[in-house]
């Protein structure tokens, strides 16, 4: 087994509102090619934790390191290309699917590889003709898959996924789970995935469980049968 390099480290991270501790004293690491799930009941701070890692909100205490650097010292634009965040309700823009998939390449001032879109669309069981489909004509499941494909165009080192299969039927949910699992192994991308779905645990290297009382965190390795 090749040695994994550390991409992300959280050290005693916490976040609170004026009256409530949402997340408290969270510490863990994420290595290249590692697949971690974050689970727990509603309101225990799962999405807040992911937003802090995405640098959308800042922790009140503690530090988050990306490749050894405090993320508050990094360019937000550059960081978010390497750490890609995909949410439960995807925000697509422009007129067509193509407008969304070309966007990450435009930011990098690069041309996409000739088969970049076709390969990823095929992985997610979407036809290449969908590139010209209006955003308004997409189903909820199509929007979620397109948003995920768009995130992959950034060629990220870390994928942050927040309940991304919630709008999918069972077939597409299993398909997305399998695709992400293979993508992690093939590209050595790290994944931090917030989910309520116990079926997704089978792909995880480790599972982080947050409890309703902030400050309680359990981390367990998932033992495959």
Q: Where do the language-model regions lie?
A:
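Hydrophobic anchor residue at the start of the ABC signature
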Residues: 147-148
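Conserved ABC ATPase "signature" region
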Residues: 114-130
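Helix-to-loop junction immediately C-terminal to a conserved catalytic motif
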Residues: 54
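Catalytic Walker B motif of ABC-type/P-loop ATPase nucleotide-binding domains
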Residues: 159-163
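Conserved catalytic motifs of ABC-family nucleotide-binding domains
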Residues: 90-99, 108
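Conserved ABC ATPase signature
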Residues: 134-138, 142
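Conserved ABC transporter NBD signature motif
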Residues: 62-70, 79
């Amino acid at each position: 087994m090749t040695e994994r390099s550390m991409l992300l480290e959280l050290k005693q991270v916490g976040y609170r509102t004026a009256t409530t501790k949402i997340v408290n004293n969270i510490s863990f690491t994420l290595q290249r090619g590692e697949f971690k799930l974050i689970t727990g009941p509603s309101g225990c701070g799962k999405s807040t934790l992911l937003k802090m890692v995405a640098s959308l909100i800042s922790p009140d205490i503690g530090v988050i390191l990306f490749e050894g650097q405090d993320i508050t010292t990094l360019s937000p634009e550059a960081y978010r290309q390497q750490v890609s965040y995909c949410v439960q309700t995807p925000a697509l823009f422009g007129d067509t699917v193509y407008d969304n998939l070309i966007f990450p390449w435009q930011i990098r001032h690069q041309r996409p590889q000739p088969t970049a879109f076709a390969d990823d669309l095929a992985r997610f069981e979407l036809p290449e003709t969908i590139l010209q489909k209006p955003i308004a004509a997409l189903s909820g499941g199509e929007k979620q898959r397109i948003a995920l494909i768009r995130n992959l165009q950034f060629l990220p080192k870390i994928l942050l996924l927040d309940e991304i299969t919630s709008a999918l039927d069972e077939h597409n949910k299993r398909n997305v789970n399998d695709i992400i699992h293979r993508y992690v192994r093939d590209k050595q991308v790290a994944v931090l995935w917030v989910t309520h779905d116990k079926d997704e645990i089978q792909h995880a290297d480790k599972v982080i469980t947050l409890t309703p009382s902030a400050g309680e965190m359990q981390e367990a390795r998932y033992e495959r049968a």
